[in-house]
Regions:
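Structural register within alpha-helical repeat arrays
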Residues: 50, 86, 93, 154, ...
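Residue at a conserved register position within TPR or TPR-like alpha-solenoid repeats
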Residues: 54, 90, 165, 213, ...
Length: 422
């Protein structure tokens, strides 16, 4: 018989012992895991039982907080029972406030709308759990139909709540509730209701959400529902104005100008879109486009003083001086308190005089024409000074030059002192 070294027996025995230890450790860990799971489940049941008792005892807010603490643990979010207890807690708070209002007792109306908002959040969260496929990969919805039917009856409270907070100038909460109202249209929970095509209040809710975002200087909130808000034709001008202001604040020039153009196309005589789009074109030296804007606006309202003044500025820049003066006189005939009409007419004459004055040589006839231009400019510039006394930067130098050329010594001395003080 072959002799086997004792070392071999030792190694085999040692290996068996090691395997046994590993097996025991695995069994211990499995037992510990099962115990921990059991303990966790037991603790959950206890908390849910306590929450149900709290709801009955009139402590629904405490029950809600307890269930939300459980759901904060990702491992618990798939537990439908926690969601259901949470909903009962929120629902009870809504019913309590509603009862107080019905009985005309003193209560905080905001709590009613806040509870309604939370009810939607809870059942939408439950629906996401309900929609998960089972172990066979199939989705079996147990709650959707019932919960959607229940919430549909309360959905109007989200809109009303948004309006409530809007009137209270609580624009952040107003946005939150209007946003929840709108987003129901995208929630799988309400798929069968087809709010997108059937709910005629969605555009107005979108406008109010946009306005709320605008009032809180939140560009993301302002622009979130802008496309839907544009379907609210009664408030389209305001929608485009708030959107344009938001793009301008963000420095998005392309979107800003595009929105101005859209607004101007809808209403060429708008007191917002015409001036802003005109300023953009004119300040960049695009006089042709600026003039086109003026003519389009005047084609609808020939006596628009804003468009007439804007056009006179373009004509002055384009050196169409006779047309500029003619238009300024028409403006003054409509309203003799508009200072810029006098300024533009005065500069139209003044510029022509300076052009002759700056020439190396000029004939006697040219000099006479120059003085005539200065005299014509004078009456407009003096009136402009009276109407805009603080705009010394615009009237001081022209009047200084006019007084000098017309030998008006006393007036020249006064203007010289004013210029030196600037």
């Amino acid at each position: 018989m072959r002799h086997v070294p004792l070392s071999i027996y030792y190694k085999v025995g040692h290996a068996v012992d090691c395997n046994r230890d590993k097996m025991f450790r695995k069994l211990f860990l499995i037992t510990l895991l099962v115990f921990a799971t059991f303990a966790s489940a037991t603790a959950q049941k206890k908390e849910m039982a306590q929450a149900k008792a709290a709801i009955k005892a009139g402590k629904a807010a405490e029950a809600e907080a307890s269930m939300r603490t459980l759901l904060a643990n990702p491992d618990n979010r798939s537990n439908e029972k926690i969601w259901l207890v949470l909903f009962d807690a929120v629902k009870k708070q809504y019913e309590d406030v509603n009862e107080q209002m019905y009985l005309k007792q003193s209560t905080d109306t905001a709590k009613l709308f806040e509870a309604a908002y939370r009810m939607f959040g809870v059942l939408e969260g439950l629906d996401s759990v309900d929609a998960q496929p089972n172990e066979n990969g199939r989705v079996q919805l147990k709650y959707r139909r019932k919960n959607a039917e229940y919430l549909d009856a309360y959905r109007k409270n989200l809109y009303t709540g948004g309006s409530f907070f809007l009137n209270k100038q609580n624009y952040q909460r107003a946005f939150t509730l209007f946003s929840a109202y709108i987003d129901c249209a995208k929630q799988p929970l309400f798929q069968s209701y087809d709010y997108t095509t059937k709910d005629k209040r969605l555009p107005s809710a979108a406008f109010y959400a946009l306005y709320s975002g605008y009032r809180t200087n939140d560009p993301v909130a302002t622009l979130r529902y802008k496309d839907l808000a544009e379907a609210d034709t009664a408030r389209l001008q305001l929608t485009l104005q708030y959107v344009a202001d938001t793009y301008r604040a963000q420095g998005d020039t392309i979107a800003y100008v595009s929105t101005l153009e859209k607004g101007f196309d809808k209403n060429p005589v708008s007191e917002y879109f015409f001036p802003h789009l005109f300023d953009y074109r004119f300040q960049r030296g695009d006089t042709t486009q600026a003039l086109t804007l003026c003519n389009r606006s005047l084609a609808i309202n020939a006596k628009s003083k804003v468009a007439m003044l804007a056009k006179s500025a373009v004509l002055l820049t384009m050196q169409h001086y006779d047309k500029c003066v003619q238009l300024c006189d028409a403006i003054i005939a409509l309203d003799d308190s508009l200072a810029d009409a006098y300024l533009n007419a005065g500069l139209a004459y003044f510029n022509q005089a300076v052009k002759i004055d700056n020439a190396p040589k000029h004939t006697r006839a040219e000099r006479a024409k120059m003085l005539e231009f200065y005299r014509n400019s004078l009456k407009y510039m003096q009136t402009y000074r009276k109407l805009a006394p603080t705009r010394k930067d615009l009237w001081a130098m022209p009047l200084y030059t006019i007084y000098l050329n017309l030998n008006m010594g006393k007036e020249f001395v006064e203007m010289d002192a004013i210029i030196k003080s600037l």
